[in-house]
A protein has these predicted regions:
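Non-catalytic, polymerase-adjacent accessory regions of viral genome-replication enzymes
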Residues: 1-69, 73
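Conserved residues at beta->alpha junctions
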Residues: 34, 109, 257
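Short alpha-helical scaffolding segments that buttress acidic/His motifs in well-ordered protein cores
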Residues: 43-47, 118, 195-200
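Short coil/turn segments at secondary-structure boundaries
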Residues: 59-66, 102-114, 135-142
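Conserved polymerase palm-domain catalytic core
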Residues: 78-93, 130-134, 138-139, 145-294
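Conserved beta-strand/loop block within the catalytic cores
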Residues: 86-108, 112
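Hydrophobic alpha-helical hairpins/lids featuring a short glycine-rich hinge
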Residues: 105-123, 127-129
Length: 295
C-alpha cells in the first residue's frame, strides 16, 4: 500500500516556523533556486505571455512585469522568511463553446501565478525523469493527438480492447497528506512542500464569499496540473508493474487489453485502485470497456 511505502517520508507534526528554521540539509538550495532572479524573471515572462483573466486582486497578466519590477525583491524576501500567503483563487463559470453546459474556472492572482510557474520550472525536470512513457498530461512536447497515436500504436500490437476511466475535473482528493508524502520522495526541501501545500489550499472566492478548500486540489494556476500529474504517476507505475499499457491525457485514462474480458477486469481493478489506494473520485458511470479495433 502507498501509505506503508510512505511511512519513512512522513513528518511528525511540526510547526511552519520550525520548518523554516530547521530546514532540510539534504537539498537546502531548492527554494533558493526557485527564487533566483533569473528563474523568477522567466516565470514572469511566461505568466505575461499566457494572459488570462485577473484573480481576486484585479491584476491582469499584462501587468506582471511591471509588478515584478516594483515588488519582486520584497516578494522574494517574504517567501524566504516563510511569510508568503497565497490569495484565494477566484471562481467563475464560463459557457462552453458550441455545446451546452459551463466550465468551472478558478483563477489565481498574478503574483501567485509567478511563484507557481517558478516552482514548476524547477521541479518539472525532476519529475520528467520518472514520469511514465504513456503520460501525456501537461508535459512539454506532448498532446492529445500524440496520446491518440500512442493508443493506435498499441492496437497494432494486438491491444484491441480498452478500459477507459474519467476522473472528476475538480481532482477530488480525499487524502491530502498522502499527496504531500509522495512529493517528499523527490522534493527534500520541506519549505517547498509547505509552500505547495499553502498554494493548493488557498481557498476559493465566489460572489465575495471565501470557501476553504477542505479536499481536492485547487485547479486555478500553473502548479496544480503538475501536482495532479505527479499524484497520478502512482497509478501509471502501479499498472506498468502489472504489465498493463496505460495512456493518460487530461482526466482520461486508457488501459489497453487484448480481449474484452481482460478490459472489463481492468475496469474493475483500476476503479478499486483509484478510489481505494489513491482515494480519488471517478466520474460516476464514466468508466467503460470498449473495443478499439479497426472495423
Amino acid at each position: 500500500m502507498i501509505a506503508e511505502q510512505d511511512d519513512k517520508h512522513a513528518r511528525d507534526h511540526i510547526s511552519f516556523r520550525k520548518i523554516w528554521k530547521d530546514r532540510d540539509d539534504e537539498e537546502p538550495q531548492l527554494l533558493e533556486k526557485i527564487l533566483s532572479r533569473d528563474n523568477l524573471k522567466s516565470a514572469c515572462r511566461r505568466v505575461k505571455a499566457s494572459g488570462g483573466a485577473p484573480g481576486v486582486d484585479g491584476m491582469h497578466a499584462e501587468e506582471a512585469k511591471t509588478w515584478f519590477d516594483e515588488n519582486g525583491r520584497e516578494f522574494m524576501v517574504r517567501i524566504l522568511k516563510g511569510k508568503y500567503t497565497p490569495r484565494p483563487v477566484l471562481h467563475t463559470e464560463v459557457q462552453k463553446k458550441g455545446e451546452a453546459g459551463v466550465l468551472n474556472i478558478t483563477v489565481s492572482t498574478v503574483p501567485d501565478r509567478i511563484i507557481q510557474q517558478a516552482i514548476v520550472q524547477q521541479i518539472m525536470p525532476i519529475y520528467e525523469q520518472i514520469f511514465a512513457d504513456g503520460n501525456y498530461c501537461n508535459r512539454p512536447g506532448r498532446s492529445a493527438q500524440a496520446a491518440g497515436l500512442k493508443v493506435l500504436e498499441y492496437t497494432q500490437q494486438g491491444y484491441t480492447n480498452a478500459a477507459i476511466q474519467n476522473l472528476s475535473e475538480s481532482f477530488a482528493l480525499e487524502n491530502f497528506g498522502q499527496l504531500l508524502n509522495i512529493l517528499r520522495r523527490n522534493i527534500t526541501d520541506e519549505r517547498v512542500i509547505q509552500i505547495i501545500k499553502r498554494i493548493l489550499k488557498s481557498g476559493i472566492m465566489e460572489c465575495d464569499t471565501l470557501t476553504a478548500c477542505k479536499e481536492g486540489i485547487l485547479q486555478g494556476g500553473t502548479l496544480a496540473p503538475l501536482i495532479a500529474n505527479i499524484y497520478l504517476n502512482e497509478f501509471d507505475q502501479e499498472f506498468a508493474g502489472r504489465g498493463v499499457p496505460v495512456v493518460r491525457y487530461a482526466g482520461d485514462i486508457v488501459l489497453l487489453a487484448k480481449s474484452r474480458r481482460a478490459a472489463e477486469r481492468l475496469l474493475e481493478t483500476s476503479s478499486k485502485y483509484l478510489e481505494g489506494s489513491l482515494r480519488l473520485r471517478v466520474n460516476e458511470n464514466s468508466g467503460r470497456a470498449i473495443c478499439i479495433c479497426k472495423r
